[in-house]
Amino acid sequence: MINKTTIKTVLITLGVLAAVNKVSALRSVKRLIS
């Protein structure tokens, strides 16, 4: 059985990775524009 804490940890990890991807994407876009 999967614990709720495990699910929370996975969701938090995915959220952090998504945030990092957004930041890197924004930086690359700014480089292309400038």
From Swiss-Prot:
One Gene Ontology term from the biological process aspect of the record: symbiont entry into host cell via disruption of host cell envelope
Membrane topology label: Single-pass membrane protein
Statement: the UniProt record of this protein carries the keyword Membrane: yes
Transmembrane segments: 10-26
Protein name: Peptidoglycan hydrolase P7
Gene designation per UniProt: VII
Cellular component per GO, a single term: viral inner membrane
Purpose: Exolysin that catalyzes the cleavage of the host peptidoglycans during virus entry.
Record organism: Pseudoalteromonas phage PM2
Keywords in alphabetical order: Capsid inner membrane protein, Degradation of host cell envelope components during virus entry, Degradation of host peptidoglycans during virus entry, Membrane, Transmembrane, Transmembrane helix, Virion, Virus entry into host cell
